[in-house]
Amino acid sequence: MDRTYVFLCIACEFKGGAFLRQLKRLGHTVFLVSSEKNKNEAWPYDDIEEAFFMPEKDGRKWDINLLIAGTAHLFRTHKIDRVIALDDYDVWKGARLREEFQIPGMGETTARHFFDKLSMRIEARDAGIPIPGFTALFNDDTIREFLKKSKGPWLAKPRRDAGSLNIRKIADADAFWHWSEETGDTRHQYLLEEFRPGIICHVDSLNYNDETLFTRASQYLDAPFEVAHGGGIFHSKTMSTKDALSKKLVNLNMKVLAAFGLRHGASHSEYIVRDGGKEILFLETSARCGGAHLTDMVEAASGISLWTEWANIEHAVLTGKKYHLPMVDELQAGIIVTLCKPEKPDYETFTDPEIWWKLHKKYHIGFIFQHKTEKKIDELLSRYTKVIQE
């Protein structure tokens, strides 16, 4: 029988239940650290040895020294074998803990490629991966040169914020310098990037021993930036694995993950597709499963639970056993999620057999559809969008 290993899992947001459950099924001891606000969420407490909650409400602003001190206290009685970061904002915390306690896994330098948008762009540029023009915001002369050579508008992006959070659109050079004054001493925490409109696609993957074993490309029907800043309905749909654009995205994604140094685990990456797929630009990546229930959509299409398989990969790495990816389905799926006025929407009138999943969250309504054809998924997303808007 394999020995029991100890996992310390960090999740500033409520997520990763399937990962925690699978580790327990495999015989491991699981400790969880989350934010105090998540204490009453439906964590799989029966599978967790002990849960600890940080006092800060904002997971981006945990006291790292308190986290280190708490980990040191736990380490006195439990030899921690792995630290796993389940959310974007946990990647740097996990790396810091690994460095502090000399635990194997991704260190702080490599981790920056997966949470620091500036580091991502520098790494991509140096690897010859196509990206929008960008500049760090350290030196005024460098910025002036970039503004002179580059064509606006631009996006000022926080280096450490996930997705589209706190991104500011900058129309011209004067607007940039006005924003720079507003930002003050925190300007270095941002980067400036050319705004390159296009279709935003995402690629969800599993890596094992430096090899990408599973990948599924999907397309947002509304750019996340527009949804985050203008409200509206969140949509995405998977792409056929036989689609030419999907194949291009998969190949580019493999190059990105190899260049960035992801050895094992899950990743969620985003790309800008322009000119009908003739140009694909890298946007960002991460060393964790995708959010917004995109993992559920991928599972509906492929039969692969990214959270579960990530746990299986961690188990294989620790025990020295070879990991085998389960059989992959070739179906299509789509997701639609938005806010609604009722606290608990009435789902009884939605009876289409293609409904694979329903969202149960206060003041939200959402569905995942599953079918063998992309055409049917498109039809369902269009029809349900109209119904929800009414």
Where in this protein do the model-derived segments appear?
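Peripheral (often C-terminal) accessory segments that flank ATP-dependent C-N-forming ligase machineries
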Residues: 143, 308-390
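Glycine-rich phosphate-binding loop signature in dinucleotide/nucleotide-binding domains
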Residues: 73-80, 148-150, 185-186
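Conserved ATP-binding module of the ATP-grasp superfamily
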Residues: 130-132, 153-156, 165-202, 218, ...
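A conserved helix-loop-beta module that forms one wall/lid of the active-site cleft
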Residues: 99-166
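ATP-dependent carboxylate/phosphate-activation module, predominantly the ATP-grasp catalytic core
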Residues: 174, 194-262, 266, 273, ...
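Short beta->alpha connector loops
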Residues: 10-15, 35-36, 89, 137-141, ...
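ATP-binding N-terminal substructure of ATP-dependent carboxylate-amine bond-forming enzymes
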Residues: 1-109, 382-389
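Short beta-strand-to-turn element immediately C-terminal to the catalytic PLP-Schiff-base lysine
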Residues: 137, 167-172, 206-208, 369-370
